[in-house]
Design a protein with these regions (language model features):
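Structural core of flavin- and non-heme-iron oxidoreductases
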Residues: 1-39, 43-44, 111, 117, ...
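Extreme N-terminal leader/targeting segments of oxidoreductases
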Residues: 1-8, 26-27, 482-484, 488-489, ...
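N-terminal glycine-rich phosphate/pyrophosphate-binding loop and immediately adjacent elements
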Residues: 3-148, 474, 521
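Active-site/ligand-binding neighborhood in enzyme catalytic cores
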Residues: 130-258, 467-481
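A glycine-rich dinucleotide-binding beta-alpha-beta segment and adjacent secondary-structure elements
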Residues: 194, 198-214, 380-389, 445-509
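Mid-domain catalytic core of redox enzymes
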Residues: 239-240, 260, 267-400
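FAD-dependent oxidoreductase catalytic-site/capping-region signature
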Residues: 384-480
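A conserved FAD-binding loop/helix module that cradles the flavin
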Residues: 506-527
Length: 532
């Protein structure tokens, strides 16, 4: 067994781990990234899922990736090419739809099909979302202040947050409070009249969420559109040419030019400890690698309770970590299609604006709530709410044959644990068929053009990508699991109770999504401590 030594070992080659490695290398540290899978990228990868068809296998949209990370790591130089998705399409099984584009006149006419007032209400609503979202976004690339024993920089950061909030007027402060601690349905009902628009807004807060629309505190997810941007356009979402793996490939290439060592097929079994300090890791192969610091891109429960072990942690801290709520009730499907999906509500001879859109198959607010309640009872939602894309319409590099397509589906709500003693390995095919049958109501030619599919259940997301209970955020995004409490007040500044061990993944502030923010922030903290 070989023994090697580095300044820092990064556990996990996902986008945050690679981000951390880049910034540490920029600080002249010797860094080794250890990835357990055969490919780097974590959940942000592109792979062939059916012969001749490639796609973003897990993470599938870009918006939250911080512009600072893109520019500082020169990702575009290494192949990162975002594609703006300006359109949104909301079809339902009754034949109704909303199709929103870059044309204000077009959008006003679309909303007028359902309401005489919601268009103006939406403009005012999105104004508040943007204002509050700016305050949230301003904290993403900052280390959250500790809840006690704050230093001068922490106090200044807290003062700045207060100053930002003071700039808001009375109405803006009221809306901010609603977003931070309110229930989505209360906000939605207070703003909008039509069932269609209410469903559209409700759908926007579900992809990374696992909460009732009636749950106080669940409205934080409604701010995600304001925090993101593509090509400088606030609130926009997009695709990446070649799939999300192009992001992590660019990050890896950037890191390797800085001298970072990246190893795949190198699963870490435990973190080595000596004299109350983390000193290295042991791989499943038995190989030991040593370092002065460890940055864990794994989720907090895996990091602390499995790799480190409760014996090396304060008892109360370990109990708190074990109580972190993890689960997003998400199921991913990738469809291989021999032709273009034809929507019953909007047939077309070729790709239309609705094909170049983020597509949300949602019936109503009640549909979303019923899906949530079913999942809570351990039953896959029938039908699920589905967030979809047809990325091959704007990126023909994803398929080998002209005219063929891939379709991405994020299906909600799908519980990690099934009731009645059922398990996902036996239920996967049945649930997949139920999803396809539901989509066929709106895409009549789907069965005809479907040549294959990949289904990743919550259990698959855990096994394949290390997402605990299928949680795409490493821990639910709820008020008591955010900011200075993410994942715990004693680890919210990326340092942990174990000397030399840091967190750099989505389980740390500011949370999930392909942002690069936890990775960048953790690296800054490690470098700051390195100089002491």
């Amino acid at each position: 067994m070989s023994e090697r030594s580095f300044d820092v070992i990064v556990i996990g080659g996902g986008h945050n781990g690679l981000t951390t490695a880049n910034y540490l290398a920029m600080g002249a540290l010797r860094v080794c990234v250890l990835e357990r899978r055969h490919i780097i990228g974590g959940a942000a990868i592109s792979e062939e899922f059916h012969p001749g068809f490639r796609n973003s296998i897990a993470s599938y949209v870009v918006s939250l990736l911080r512009p600072e990370v893109v520019s500082e790591l020169e990702l575009e130089k290494y192949g990162y090419e975002p594609i703006l998705l300006e359109n949104s399409f909301y079809p339902d099984s009754n034949g109704d739809y909303l199709l929103l584009t870059g044309s204000e006149a077009h959008n006003q006419a679309q909303y007028a099909k359902f309401s005489n007032s919601d268009y103006e209400a939406l403009k005012e609503y999105y104004g508040y979302v943007e204002k509050v979202g700016e305050i949230v976004a301003s904290q993403w690339l900052k280390t959250p202040p500790p809840l006690s024993g704050a230093g001068v920089n922490d106090l200044l950061n807290t003062v700045q947050i207060g100053m930002d909030m003071l700039k808001l007027d009375k109405q803006e402060k009221h809306r901010m409070l609603q977003f931070f601690v309110g229930a989505p349905i209360s906000i939605i009902d207070s703003w909008f009249d039509s069932a269609k628009v209410k469903a559209m807004i409700a759908a926007s807060c579900t992809p990374a969420n696992y909460a009732s629309l009636h749950q106080p505190g669940a409205a934080m997810a409604m701010l995600h559109h304001a925090v993101g941007e593509v090509h400088g356009k606030k609130g926009a979402w997009g695709l990446v040419k070649g799939g999300m793996g192009s992001i992590t490939k660019a990050m890896a290439a950037s890191a390797q030019t800085k001298g970072v060592s990246i190893r795949t097929n190198s699963a870490v079994s435990r973190i080595l400890v000596s004299d109350s300090s983390a000193i290295g890791v042991e791989l499943e192969s038995g190989e030991k690698i040593y370092a002065k610091a460890i940055a864990a891109n794994t989720d907090p429960k895996t990091t602390f309770l499995k790799m480190l072990g409760e014996d090396h942690l304060p008892r109360r801290f370990a109990r708190d970590i074990s109580a972190i709520r993890q689960e997003s009730a998400s199921l991913r499907m990738n469809l291989a299609l021999s032709g273009l999906p034809q929507f019953a509500c909007l047939p077309s001879d070729g790709p239309g604006e609705h094909h170049r859109a983020g597509i949300m198959f949602v019936e109503s607010v009640e549909h979303i709530e019923q899906a949530y309640r079913a999942a809570r009872a351990g039953v896959p939602a029938t039908p699920p709410f589905i967030d979809a894309l047809i990325p091959s319409v704007v990126d023909d590099s994803l398929t080998d044959e002209p005219g063929t397509h891939v379709m991405s589906l994020l299906c909600k709500y799908m519980p990690y644990e099934l009731s009645g003693g059922k398990d996902w390995d036996t239920e996967k095919e049945r649930v997949s068929e139920d999803i396809i049958n539901y989509l066929t109501k709106m895409i009549p030619n789907l069965r005809e053009i479907l040549v294959g599919y990949q289904c990743l259940t919550p259990l698959d997301l855990e096994r394949d990508f290390g997402l605990p209970r299928g949680d795409i955020c490493h821990g639910r995004l709820e008020p008591d699991q955010l900011f200075s409490a993410r994942p715990h007040p004693d680890a919210a500044q990326y340092q942990t109770p174990m000397k030399g061990l840091y967190l750099c993944g989505s389980g740390a502030h500011p949370g999930g999504g392909v942002t690069g923010a936890p990775g960048r922030n953790a690296a800054k903290q490690i470098l700051k401590n390195w100089k002491k």
